[in-house]
């Protein structure tokens, strides 16, 4: 079983990693090709392309200039320790043991606009390049065209290392990022957990809570060494509970009702 997550815009390179083990991303050459194109953009063009502030544009202009195809602890940090958004607040990798991270290395993947597909301990140099960015490149008009079938093929290769009964992809990524996966070419069923909160008289997805819950779900799977999707139904972190009536074979709905 593999769980896929979205990356985070916010990054933490200040906190020292609590583990030394690291790996190198599989798609460094592809990332270098994208960096080459990004380096041709001015800060103003970056701001326009990504719809970000001038300050952020200048920061990323500098990041692209400093990016190197040679990865080391001097210029990079393990992906799940560097990402610092809502999902990673839930996953909370800095409190996972070395054994937990070793398990995650084989069962968790992070989709990335620049790096394609990352393992948790893959070294990550700071960047910003969301998957939905319409960045024209030699392979097409956007990053979905750039990555094509590569991400799906890499997922298939990893899934084949699992026992047949455990060959399932659990989609804990956003729609923007999961669009980079080709379901028709994926050699495994897909299960998507959905997290809903009671608000305004009905259950609905609240973005901040749903993102955090995706990270909590990934952590739950890692800590409990879950390898079959049925086991995910026991997830109960932060007050969520599986709702069988609202779920089906491909969508697992978890709901919680907090007093308003």
From Swiss-Prot:
Q: Where do the coiled-coil regions begin and end?
A: none
Top-level division of the source organism's lineage: Bacteria
GO-annotated cellular components? cytosol
InterPro entries linked: YaaA
Q: Name one GO biological process term.
A: response to hydroperoxide
Q: Which family does it belong to?
A: Belongs to the UPF0246 family.
In its UniProt entry, what is this protein called? UPF0246 protein Bphyt_1375
Protein source organism: Paraburkholderia phytofirmans (strain DSM 17436 / LMG 22146 / PsJN)
């Amino acid at each position: 079983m593999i769980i896929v997550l979205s990356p985070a815009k916010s990054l933490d390179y200040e906190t020292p990693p609590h583990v030394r083990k690291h790996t190198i991303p599989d798609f460094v050459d592809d990332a270098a090709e994208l960096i080459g194109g990004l380096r041709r953009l001015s800060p103003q063009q970056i701001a326009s392309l990504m719809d970000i502030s001038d300050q952020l544009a200048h920061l990323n202009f500098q990041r692209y200039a400093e990016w190197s195809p040679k990865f080391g602890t001097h210029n990079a940090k393990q992906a799940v320790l560097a990402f610092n958004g809502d999902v990673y607040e839930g996953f909370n990798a800095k409190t996972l043991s070395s054994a937990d991270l070793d398990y995650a290395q084989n069962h968790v993947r992070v989709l990335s606009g620049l790096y394609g597909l990352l393992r948790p301990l893959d070294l990550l140099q700071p960047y910003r390049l969301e998957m939905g960015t319409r960045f024209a490149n030699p392979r097409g008009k956007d990053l979905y065209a750039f990555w094509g079938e590569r991400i799906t093929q890499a997922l298939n290769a990893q899934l084949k290392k699992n026992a047949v009964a455990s060959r399932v992809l659990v989609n804990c990524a956003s729609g923007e990022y999961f669009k980079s996966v080709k379901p028709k070419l994926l050699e495994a069923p897909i299960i998507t957990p959905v997290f809903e909160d009671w608000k305004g008289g009905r259950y609905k997805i609240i973005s901040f809570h749903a993102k955090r819950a995706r990270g909590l779900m990934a952590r739950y799977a890692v800590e409990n060494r879950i390898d079959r999707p049925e086991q995910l139904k026991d997830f109960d972190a932060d007050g969520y509970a599986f709702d069988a009536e609202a779920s089906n074979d491909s969508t697992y709905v978890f709901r919680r009702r907090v007093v308003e």
